[in-house]
């Protein structure tokens, strides 16, 4: 008997831990701190940026979800991963990584950006927030941009870190 794994969809389900210590997956694939809000909707989770994010809510059909966003407002907890880039050379690094100049982004403002390899292949996209003159957060879609920051930061005075924040979206 041959089983074709492409015929299956693998998801993570939220189950009660009954006060026991967290299992390994809880430490290596964290869920959004507000994911308890999704539990009444019987969510199925998938990995996005090494974080668990809801892929489906089993108490609502795809059509119901579509119309909820079109005619109402939803509060969605996402797997977008913010990375903090700070230091005197932060702007220089980001101008190496992104295709659009970040020099024009003023503190307190955002800019849509996308990162490409040197040959033009796209790595990922997201929103860049300039928090201060030398401090940025980039909320990225799924992709390995952290390694690309590190590869391009040689001889630059920058710090690249996870600011330990999670993103929620208001849609509709």
Language model features: what each stretch is:
Residues 2-116, 121:
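Acidic, proline/glycine-enriched N-terminal capping motif
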Residues 79-81, 111, 124, 134-136, ...:
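Structural beta-strand/beta-sheet cores of well-ordered domains, especially the beta-sheet scaffolds
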Residues 127-172:
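Acidic, low-complexity central loop/insert segments
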Residues 119-124, 131:
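Long, hydrophobic/aromatic-enriched structural stretches that serve as scaffold segments
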